[in-house]
């Protein structure tokens, strides 16, 4: 019996491993969308990225539900999901930093679009518009990274809460 327990433990991958796999799939899907399909960063393809993210979290928690441990409480499920989505959020933030650093034209297009809007408003001086563009250029990457981190943390927490609530029900039977 002890040997079976050890083999099952060895076959299970950790939330870290599942987070790495999930983030890898998300990065591959992002690269496919950006470079093969030529979608803009803010396309509807992002929904697929979030579905992969959600499935990765649930996969990690569901795998834990099949483990032989008796400690299957809401907090344990949440802990597994949390560890998974934190790894994904970290790697996706690194990916976003890398992408935006290597593709400054995305930043420049956003700044130009913002400047056009300010010109059309007609209530800004040219010097104000240029100063605004310079400020946006300085804070663009930190702003985009903050938004990415916040998005992944919020979505990850929501998915984890829902899945932990479902999986921790006493009458829930794992297939």
Q: What kind of region is each of these model predictions?
A:
Residues 25-33, 53-57, 88-96, 155, ...:
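Alpha-helical transmembrane segments of multipass membrane proteins
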Residues 13, 17-21, 79-91:
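Alpha-helical transmembrane segments of multi-pass membrane proteins
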Residues 2-8, 168-175:
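Short, charged juxtamembrane terminal tails flanking transmembrane helices
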Residues 94-123:
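Functional transmembrane-helix hotspots
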Residues 2-63:
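Transmembrane alpha-helical insertion/packing segments
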Residues 134-157:
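Individual transmembrane alpha-helix segments
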